[in-house]
Regions:
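N-terminal topogenic module of multi-pass integral membrane proteins
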Residues: 1-91, 255
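Interhelical loop and helix-boundary elements at the membrane-water interface
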Residues: 1-15, 64-73, 112-132, 181-197, ...
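Hydrophobic, aromatic-enriched interface-forming segments
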Residues: 127-180
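Core segments of transmembrane alpha-helices
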Residues: 16-22, 79-86, 130-137, 196-210, ...
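Solvent-exposed interhelical
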Residues: 56-74, 162-205
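Transmembrane alpha-helical segments that form the membrane-embedded catalytic/substrate-channel core
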Residues: 44-55, 110-115, 161-177, 227-238
């Protein structure tokens, strides 16, 4: 009898993109709600369904006929979605209906990403679309904790999407640098490969400054983005073909934790 191994995402960094915003959303209310635990469990279930569902969508779009893979993907997609739904239902029965449209945004971003990846595999745009959907966990958790979908909920979503977009763009920079196979890169190569990275971080920080200027978000939000922005600039200047991705992963997790700590104490 064939042993069925769980299908789980290989992009472990995506877990941080989901659960760091969730911690922020739960913490800024300064009051703990037990419903957050159910939301976290439900979110994990739907998050794990991503890989098998992506396989099914690709099979549908590409006309795949690998029956074994399709059958296994259906099984695990059903298990994960079923688990997510089990934890979701009590929240809906308790009146937390606002998480439904937020979840729909997450599902829509998944479908859009899965569709576009056929033509834009490995492109920054595809991963940025995923970030928009994954960071919906921030407003969803805030809504469950506070019972409100207000300016703070929208701000948390915007800030988290912008920040984790920074990490995505930066990782793509490192991937392009590694693909060059050059031990040392000249300034022309660094500028060519790093333009998008620098431009995105500049625009993201500028937008955060604008939000602070119009009193839409606390001033500390600027400080929260500063470390990642400086790291992105340094990473472009020091870019080479030698990249230690495991070390990079730990650094970005540290950046995410620092971002979360600063935003939690921003005083929303």
């Amino acid at each position: 009898m064939r042993r069925l191994n769980p299908i789980i995402p290989k992009e472990h960094g995506a877990l941080a993109v989901v659960f760091v915003p969730m911690v922020i959303g739960a913490s800024v209310t300064q009051s703990f709600s037990p419903w957050v635990i159910l939301l976290a469990a439900s979110t994990l279930g739907f998050f794990l369904s991503y890989v098998p569902m992506q396989t099914l969508v690709r099979g549908l779009l590409d006309g795949s006929r690998d029956a074994a893979i399709i059958r296994e993907s259906k099984l695990w997609a059903g298990i994960y979605i079923g688990a997510g739904t089990i934890f979701l239902v009590p929240m809906l029965l308790n009146g937390h209906w606002m998480i439904v449209p937020l979840g729909a945004v997450g599902a829509a971003s998944f479908m859009l990403r899965a569709s576009l990846e056929r033509w834009f595999h490995g492109r920054v745009l595809v991963d940025l679309i995923a970030v928009v959907g994954l960071t919906v966990s921030a407003p969803a958790t805030y809504v469950v904790s506070s019972g409100l979908f207000d300016q703070t909920a929208a701000t948390l979503w915007i800030l988290n999407a912008l920040f984790f977009g920074c990490t995505v763009v930066y990782v793509h920079l490192k991937i392009r640098g590694s693909a060059s196979k050059k031990r040392r890169l000249g300034w022309s190569d660094k500028i060519r490969l790093g333009t998008l990275n620098l431009l995105y971080h500049l625009l993201a920080l500028s937008f955060v400054i604008f939000l602070v200027a119009v009193h839409y978000t606390p001033r500390i939000a600027i400080i929260a983005f500063a470390p990642m922005t400086m790291h992105a600039i340094y990473g472009t200047v020091s870019l080479s073909g030698q990249v230690r991705f495991k070390r990079l992963g730990f650094i970005l997790v540290g950046q995410s934790v620092l971002f979360a700590v600063l935003l939690i104490h921003a005083g929303f």
